[in-house]
A protein has these predicted regions:
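Active-site neighborhoods and metal-handling regions in enzymes and metal-associated proteins
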Residues: 1-296
């Protein structure tokens, strides 16, 4: 079952008359569209992409199962035409409540009459369980990042700036098929290595520094994300101790992970391991969750 079929089955289960999709992530996942200006209207049995003249050819090539409509001036007139064509004169239409701006929602309400109601649908839930073909793309994105990092390690040296290291890493990912970095690449060395989101700077990497990298590749719309920490030159006894504590906590988490285990419980397993080694107070007190997805 592809993305469109999964969405249409969900509309039937929820007894919705249709769904409006506007976010780039969901347009990519459910329609295959990678342009910047479009929205989709999907019912149980039909699917339309509404876009302007710049993307009609692209949408025709990318959006299998969708009818492509080019709007001229008012995008909502095209939606009304679709509703009239399929005799949808009322009911409940799903929208992306988390992604639709208030002004867009108000325009939508003004365009459709009082016979329509709107309900917010979290499409991320439909994307959460990955199909086999999605897993292939995710593994490819991870492999690209991993291979690029291995090359970086052969070039990384004291005297290089964090930004120079970032450029090498991102270039190696691009040469291996990544379309862009997953996010702003983090390279944090020395005193900056304690920053969870220490985006690369002009700081010079020095001998003896911890250097933390947080980076990822994008392949087929799927993002990888990995964090690696290295030492420039021989590690001190304290660096070895800290590295080993974090590594053991990670391995405990890997060993414990299984279907049905909550992220909170998994976090506690790793956190407790670090606390047992005397560094519980140094652990950042926040919860962080990321869903692997098509898009960003």
């Amino acid at each position: 079952m592809n993305g469109l079929q999964r969405l249409q089955a969900h509309l039937q289960e929820q007894q919705l008359n249709g769904m409006i999709i506007m976010s780039p992530i969901n347009l990519h996942y459910f329609a295959g569209f990678t342009g910047t200006t479009a929205f989709a209207f999907v019912t149980e049995n039909t699917a339309h992409i509404i876009t302007d003249f710049r993307y009609t050819e692209q949408a025709t090539q990318q959006c299998e199962g969708y009818t492509v409509i080019q709007y001229e001036t008012n995008v909502w007139d095209s939606l009304i035409d679709i509703l009239n064509e399929y005799h949808i004169h009322g009911g409940v239409i799903g929208i992306e409540g988390k992604d639709m701006p208030v002004d867009t929602y108000e325009l939508l309400c003004d365009a459709l009459d009082e016979h329509f109601d709107f309900t917010s649908i979290n499409l991320q839930e439909l994307r959460a369980v990955k199909r086999p073909d999605e897993l292939v793309l995710m593994r490819k994105a991870a492999n690209i990042a991993d291979e690029a990092f291995r090359v970086l390690l052969t070039k990384l040296k004291p005297g290089m700036s964090e930004n120079e290291a970032r450029i090498i890493l991102e270039s190696e990912m691009l040469m291996r098929g990544s379309t862009e970095p997953s996010f702003a690449t983090i390279v944090a060395s020395g005193h900056r290595s304690s920053m969870p989101h220490g985006v690369a700077s002009d700081k010079i990497i020095e001998a003896g520094d911890f250097v933390t990298f947080d980076f990822g590749a994008v392949y087929g719309g799927y993002h990888s994300d990995m964090t690696r920490t290295v030492v420039m030159g021989p590690a001190s006894d304290l660096q070895k101790k800290l590295y080993d504590i974090v590594l053991r906590a990670q391995l405990k988490g890997v060993e414990a992970v299984r279907p049905g285990l909550s992220g909170v419980d998994l976090d506690k397993i790793c956190r407790d391991s670090i606390a047992a080694n005397g560094y519980g107070d140094c652990f950042y007190q926040y919860r962080f969750a990321r869903c692997r997805r098509s898009g960003r």
